[in-house]
């Protein structure tokens, strides 16, 4: 029931109750109930995600990351790179932090195929990019050999070519670890579905000013970001995942590790 107040009168008027509506006797179907065929991209997403949830035993670990130092060092880097037309984003720092973490814990940079775990030599970070027809996760190839500037340039180039339909076969198929960032949509936290045959995926939310209690019980305000790791339980256990996400947290809270 909708109630509309026009603000013009406080008079109460008695009205007859509405008569019941008799359903039409024809066999027409409401338009809202008509099935809609999925487009090709939506259908592919459905197949991949359904397969992942049915076949991959996911486990999830989440943490809060203080991004104060990361934001500070990002500002410093961008000031120095201003004349080079390079601007480092928060997502660039997250990608670089994930790469350094994967170097220390390479089991999360593996794939699961034919009941075997294969650790990939190269770190190719797949990033979730939203398009009009759905979602795609192309890969930045060779992140293990890229510094923060290279990652920034590669990411911008990849996003542009994704939107123009100019990806290479390797960028479509050779990802080894995925990152989905919904921070730009004001999402705090979420859990991602692993993209097989990859065995891990990182989900990050927005950076928000949040009250933080210090070791001396003092309260301050910091820039906090939630991050969640989705991992394949056939490949790793919770303890290994905890070490991974703790290292990722350390890399972002001490970002000097990302630029030296």
Q: Which role fits each region the language model picked out?
A:
Residues 2, 7-260:
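C-terminal catalytic/motor cores of large multi-domain enzyme assemblies
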């Amino acid at each position: 029931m909708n109630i509309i107040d026009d603000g013009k009168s406080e008079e109460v008027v008695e009205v007859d109750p509405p008569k019941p509506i008799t359903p039409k006797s024809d066999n027409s179907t409401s338009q809202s109930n008509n099935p809609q065929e999925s487009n090709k991209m939506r259908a592919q997403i459905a197949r991949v995600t359904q397969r992942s949830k049915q076949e991959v035993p996911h486990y999830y670990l989440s943490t809060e990351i203080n991004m104060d130092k990361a934001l500070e060092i990002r500002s410093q880097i961008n000031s120095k790179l201003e004349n080079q037309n390079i601007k480092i984003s928060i997502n660039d720092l997250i990608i670089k932090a994930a790469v350094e973490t994967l170097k220390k814990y390479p089991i999360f940079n593996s794939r699961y195929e034919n009941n075997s775990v294969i650790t990939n030599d190269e770190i190719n970070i797949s990033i979730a990019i939203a398009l009009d027809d759905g979602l795609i996760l192309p890969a930045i190839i060779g992140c293990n050999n890229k510094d923060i500037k290279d990652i920034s340039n590669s990411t911008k180039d990849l996003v542009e070519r994704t939107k123009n339909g100019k990806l290479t076969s390797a960028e479509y198929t050779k990802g080894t670890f995925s990152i989905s960032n919904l921070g730009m949509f004001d999402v705090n936290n979420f859990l991602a579905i692993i993209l097989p045959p990859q065995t891990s995926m990182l989900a990050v939310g927005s950076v928000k000013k949040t009250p933080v209690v210090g070791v001396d019980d003092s309260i301050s305000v910091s820039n906090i970001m939630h991050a969640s790791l989705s991992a394949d339980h056939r490949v790793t256990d919770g303890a290994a995942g905890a070490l991974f996400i703790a290292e990722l947290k350390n890399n972002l809270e001490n970002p000097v590790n990302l630029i030296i």
